Amino acid sequence: MSGLRVLITNNTLAGRAGTELYVRDTALELLKRGHSPIAYSTILGEVARELVKANVPVVDDLYNLAVVPDLIHGQQHMELMTALLHFPQVPAIQFVHNSRSWYEKPVHFPRILRYVAVDHVCRDLLLEHAVPETRIRVVLNFVDLARFRSRRKPLAAAPQRALLFSNYASEETHLPAVREACARASIQLDVVGSQTNTATMQPEEILGEYDLVFAKARSALEAMAVGAAVVLCDYEGSGPMVTPSNFARLRPLNFGRRALSEPLDARVILEEIRRYNPTEAFRVSQTVRATAGHESVVDELSSLYEEVIREFQQNGHCEKLEEDRAAAAYLRQLKIDFTANTAAATRLRERFERVPLVGRIGVALARSFMRGK
């Protein structure tokens, strides 16, 4: 099918976080292929402006959308359900990017015909919520290879410069442990991220300057694509140096939480730094560039879009009573989840506020918890 009109939802299109950038990169590639992506979120900002500049329509109220999409690519369940109820004859796919976020919990609704997990951890979440395995697809995360080009110079024989690449990096999270490990190894460390007021709109322009990058998930994948050696690390814990021997195990985990099984201890991180090997980093980068490019992933998504549209056309429309009851069940669960998460975030914020050195970052993490980031 050509010229599909795809409505992509997300809880925000403001900061440059994982799902926001997934929307941006997917929409831009769809546009390049002759499709008509439209982005919807009630919170607009930097990423929304990037999309508009690239001629992708962005709306924060579906009543302002004068056309009916062929398919809903739904990220975060409240925005997905808003779109499903606004467009009663349109099928949908729910995408799950985060196994711990209440915003990402799977929704049971008659017109959600497929569920996409970006890693095996999210696939497990879908299975735990009674989503039939036949409706689940695992489509691993990707990197825009046209933006994140291979570095021009080979890595140094021993790491000279390192980057901590994380929006959660601060004095109250994993920055001290990483800094101490780098100091022991005589490596200069820079930090890029929102908590240190050093975030950048063009990470692809700086990643190639570093021999070693500490990151997780999408950020780690981008650093690998450029050619840096990568140690998995974030505020939740530390993980291994990514090597040719462990890449196949870590890739289905999205280089994320489940891979961060070690404590945030300078000694642990230093052990991983000592595994630095320019030849192995180059091999990892070649593997990423051969298997994790955005074009092949959007090929897969396009095929899935077409599959869902055909299935919906063949099977006919859903009964209104069935949809109404599914919507009622969703609202009931939404109230339960919202109440539980509001209480948990309040307790977390109050606990952090009582610790002087942790207060600011703790409140930020509590807010992030509520937003599902």
Language model feature labels by segment:
Residues 218-283, 287:
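Catalytic binding pocket for nucleotide-activated donors in carbohydrate/polymer assembly enzymes
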Residues 113-125, 132-148, 315:
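Donor nucleotide-sugar binding/catalytic pocket of nucleotide-sugar-dependent glycosyltransferases
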Residues 18, 153-155, 260-326:
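A charged, aromatic-enriched C-terminal amphipathic alpha-helix characteristic of glycosyltransferases
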Residues 321-373:
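Boundary detector for helix-to-coil junctions that initiate low-complexity/charged tails
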Residues 74-79, 96:
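Short His-centered aromatic/hydrophobic patch
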Residues 10-22, 170-173:
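A short, glycine/small-residue-rich beta-strand->loop->alpha-helix junction that serves as a flexible
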Residues 104-107, 127-128, 142-158, 201-202:
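Acidic anion/phosphate-binding donor-loop and adjacent secondary structure
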Residues 7, 116, 137-147, 154-172:
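Conserved donor-binding/catalytic core segment of Leloir-type glycosyltransferases
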